[in-house]
């Protein structure tokens, strides 16, 4: 799975960038020819991590560029799968629930402020990528937040439970519901 361009944000402690550069269609043909990748994650405005923009601002993906890149790739190989890295949709209700649980568990305003500042990619933007031909949408940050919100809530409501399997069922159910919702929405 190749990534062409620079994707801003923080994927992990070793993979960070303050800026993004869009994938250049003129460089794409050479990249695909040189690498032979069959899965491509172009940079079109998505970002790694939970902060995909400023609070109150919507993320705007370059759907026109996505179509152009797919056209270039299809001239070389119709079997190349397009992937969206950093495409988490961060639902306000999940964030609000997590903030409530953090307030219950910790009294730190910094924790809740950080969660309240998270900005994701709106589903209509993701749907535009799917309609353009993207086949794989990476939503790791969204999955982590769904998992953590469910886990914090379960711990806060069941303080005497020490069996990890109890919590596994709750977090697995939360993730499953999130995945089902995505399938319904696509």
Residue ranges and their predicted role:
Residues 150-186:
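Extended, intrinsically disordered, low-complexity segments
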Residues 84-89, 121, 137-144:
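Short acidic/histidine-rich active-site segments
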Residues 1-81, 96, 100-112, 123-127, ...:
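Alpha/beta enzyme core
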Residues 91-93:
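Short glycine/serine/threonine-rich phosphate/pyrophosphate-binding segments
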Residues 112, 116-119, 126-127, 135-136, ...:
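Metallocofactor- and cofactor-centric catalytic cores in central/energy metabolism, strongly enriched
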Residues 131-161:
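A hydrophobic, small-residue-rich beta->alpha segment in the mid-to-C-terminal subdomain
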């Amino acid at each position: 799975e190749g990534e062409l361009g620079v994707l801003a944000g923080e994927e992990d402690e070793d993979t960070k960038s303050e800026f993004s550069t869009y994938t250049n269609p003129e460089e794409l043909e050479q990249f695909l020819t040189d690498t032979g990748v069959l899965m491509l994650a172009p940079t079109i405005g998505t970002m790694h991590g939970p902060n995909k923009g400023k609070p109150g601002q919507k993320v705007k993906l370059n759907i026109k560029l996505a179509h152009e890149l797919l056209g270039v790739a299809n001239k070389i190989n119709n079997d190349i799968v397009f992937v969206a890295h950093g495409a988490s949709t961060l639902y306000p209700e999940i964030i609000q629930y997590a903030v409530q649980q953090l307030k219950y568990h910790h009294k730190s305003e910094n924790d809740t402020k950080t969660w309240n500042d998270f900005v994701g990619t709106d589903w209509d933007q993701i749907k535009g990528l799917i309609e353009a031909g993207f086949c794989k949408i990476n939503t790791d940050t969204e999955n982590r937040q769904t998992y953590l919100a469910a886990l914090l809530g379960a711990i806060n409501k069941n303080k005497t439970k020490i069996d990890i399997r109890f919590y596994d069922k709750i977090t697995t159910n939360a993730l499953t519901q999130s995945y089902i919702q995505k399938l319904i929405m696509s």
